Amino acid sequence: MRLDFWLLDLNHEAHEGKSAIWLWGVTHDNKRVLVIDANFQAYFYLLPKRGQDIDRLKEKIEREKPHPSIERVVIEKKKRLAKEREVLKIFSREPDSLEKSARECVKQLGVEASFEDKLRYSIKYQIEFEIRPCQWYSAEGTESSVDPRKYHVDKVFEISGHPTAIPRENAPKLRLLSFSIVAISPTGSPSPIRDPVRLVAWKNSDGHSSTVQSEKNSDEEIIDGLSKIHQKFDPDVVFSFGGNTFDWPYLIKRANLTKTKLSVGRDDGPARQSLYGHFSLTGRANVDLLDFSGDLYDVKIKTVENVAKFLGVEASNPAIDETEYYAHWTGNDRSALVGQMKAQAASVFNVGEDALDYTLQLSNLSALPPDQVLAAAVGFRVDSYLMMEAHKLGELIPAREELNIVPYKGAIVLEPSVGLHDRVAVLDFSAMYPSLMVKYNISPDTLVDSAGEDVFEVPEVGHHFRKNPPGLYKIVLSQLIASRQAAKREAAKTPRGTREHKILKAREKATKVITNATYGYAGWAGSRWYSREVAESAAALGRDTINKSIDLAKSLGLKVLYGDTDSLFVEYNEKLVSQFIKEIDKNLGLEINLGQLYTRILFTEAKKKYAGLMDDGELDVVGMEAIRGDWSNLARNVQNEVLRLVLEDANPTRAKSYVTNLIKDLESAKVPKPSLVIWKTLTKRPDEYEVNAPHVEVARKMAKEGWSVSVGDKVGFIITKKPGKLYQKAEPHFKVSMEQVDYDYYVNNQIVPAAARVLEVFGIAEKDLVGTSGQVSL
């Protein structure tokens, strides 16, 4: 019997006494299925030393069995950095014993190394048969005697071979669920040891939303209610925002303490912590959108509301601060808190729905399941992709080792032409570093010791790379670049707003992420194919390319105002820009495209800091405090408005007037308190700091009062009129009234510096805004 299904998730389980892979999928008629493949035997490789007799090694292993799990041995030809070698392929009846078995073999046989013994059984299965999540497959098999109701599926199949990919583009209609929990404490942050969950708000893709609440000082009803939501609606994808760091750990601890079963997986099991710190729900994809926000570099303060605003999806702003939850829950205004949490669950759902296509495309490309791919650092995404591709090329997959990295010179950044400039175009090289690695065959397996007839020498650093045959990086990057270009072409031909267009744009973005990250992967400490020479050579070629491009632009009469890594900012002249693009292709063999066009742009003296006004009137701010997370909203708003005014007017008059008027409003307490809050992130536990910084002191105060503050938390504080040093004047934002605010501090240390960083380009310094008494000149 043939079965076609779309793969959502997979895991390693025992089935009838054998190791098996369980594949969770959806059929073309929207049925949920569990496909069991018990036909894969785990193995690892042994690489003999030069001169060792491989046949004798094989006989010895078969005779002496260095580890009892070894079942059989075969000799194969594989590649080690493109060089063909004979290896021993050792099959084991116990997947969990691979590493021990390999260690004993290396010890007893004295071979050079073992390979692929540290890879998980499920990952080896994916690599062996090229199984990627979020793709359609076909398999032959029979219906299993396993009761499908036990696993919340419509049918269970046992297959005779292995799944094979079939060309089918779109994912099936998935069932989506979002949720958010509330736990409250009368003193500080809630603790799962002490404080029960009082409320769960949820929304699903059928359009239903509600809450589960508990009046008791216990949360058995809440945990049981959340379990029933998962069992009844049976979601494929579960969205949260911070679920991996807060919701799931809290729920699991509460379930254990109350001895209440948390049944959220398709196996009716709990959430289980897995790779990359994420929590796995068997047969479902647990997608934490806080991880997704990590890919949105322009969103500095990671809240679901900020992410929703960036994506342009609907979200409500919370009116009730977390510090006020207890008062609302125990007082007469509980309904407002319940309403806010329902709105938050809806916001999480909207963000998740918008992010889903990108998540599925990134999962398919990297081969990491949807619940892992966002939690994984970009290096691990590339790692997973490269393992799959290396196996197809017959390469042995080396173990990942943490290395001591030797720093190397990075990308070139030009000195900006300070001041205002009209009609400025940004010219972006398309995948410049990957393209250079392809062009010059830069790869760990093409690196050679000396120059030769068929060898390329990298300028400046002097490393040598073989021109032929293509290396690992050239092969995989060529495929990625071609795939991205194909998605881009198809998207251009597809009507905007259609489902197909959105999927193609998501595929293009996912491919771009993996392509650009591959260059950095070469110099990443956790890389399986680490090579400082590769990373250093790619950076050197990038610098050489930018310098040649600048010379070419100047020869055409095109004025270059700034350059950063793989982009040039030029005075826009349509004819000259068009000619320049053609000359780059002709002379350098690279693609450069017209990117952003600014009506007017302001460059400061610092590199990587500028702001531009676009044709639609939108302000684009890069590298300045306006988009950083360590100033108050007041300072960011001041700088944004000053930038907007000087860019609109091409002079500082109106901007300076705006600053003086704002200072009057501040001194009259006419600004909202939230705009005065300064947020800083803890990089250590509060007790580990040796300095007395304001956010550290506030964190210590909060900890003493029962609030949970730890590494990675953002601490919000306001500077008050209290005497003492700055750190002594800082108080938690929720404990400060407007009468306690030190307005002089905000004038002299927030408004004036934020404005002066822009206005100093026009010769207006802080001293021109501040009088001799230390107060601002009005």
Predicted segments with their positions:
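C-terminal polymerase-core module
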Residues: E571-P732
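N-terminal accessory regions of nucleic-acid-interacting proteins
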Residues: L81-P172, S366
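Short glycine-rich phosphate-binding loop at a beta-alpha junction
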Residues: D236-G243, L561, F569
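Active-site-proximal helix-loop-helix substrate-binding element of RNase H-like nuclease domains
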Residues: S210-Q213, D234, V238, W248-L251, ...
